[in-house]
Amino acid sequence: MALSSQIWAACLLLLLLLASLTSGSVFPQQTGQLAELQPQDRAGARAGWTPMLQRRRRRDTHFPIYIFCCGCCHRSKCGMCCKT
């Protein structure tokens, strides 16, 4: 019984480790690949990156991130800053 529990725990730990290794961000790996490219290939690679980076910067309007109001809007006591 104890051996079975240890095997399950080891398998779970291994799965969690593999999941954490594979779920890393795509950007650091790809930026490392950009550094390895030849100078003439970099311009084409960066041109392909710009739409992806622009999409990444755009905020989802359904889940906005607000900070405390700085008095920038007409309702200065609303608690949410309209500049964010």
UniProtKB/Swiss-Prot annotation:
The record's subcellular locations are:
Secreted
Presence of keyword Transmembrane: no
Question: Where does the signal sequence lie?
Answer: 1-24
One biological process GO term for this chain? defense response to bacterium
What keywords does the record list, in alphabetical order? Antibiotic, Antimicrobial, Cleavage on pair of basic residues, Disulfide bond, Hormone, Secreted, Signal
Superkingdom, natural source: Eukaryota
Q: Name one GO cellular component term.
A: extracellular space
Cystine crosslinks: C69-C72, C70-C78, C73-C81
Q: Name one GO molecular function term.
A: hormone activity
Q: Name one Pfam family in it.
A: Hepcidin
| Propeptide feature: residues | 25-54
Q: How does the record describe its quaternary structure? A: Interacts with SLC40A1; this interaction promotes SLC40A1 rapid ubiquitination.
Q: Which PANTHER family match?
A: HEPCIDIN (PTHR16877:SF0)
Which family does the record assign?
A: Belongs to the hepcidin family.
* Function, in words: Liver-produced hormone that constitutes the main circulating regulator of iron absorption and distribution across tissues. Acts by promoting endocytosis and degradation of ferroportin/SLC40A1, leading to the retention of iron in iron-exporting cells and decreased flow of iron into plasma. Controls the major flows of iron into plasma: absorption of dietary iron in the intestine, recycling of iron by macrophages, which phagocytose old erythrocytes and other cells, and mobilization of stored iron from hepatocytes.
What is the official name of this protein in its record? Answer: Hepcidin
Q: Which organism is it from?
A: Pongo abelii
Lineage of origin: Eukaryota, Metazoa, Chordata, Craniata, Vertebrata
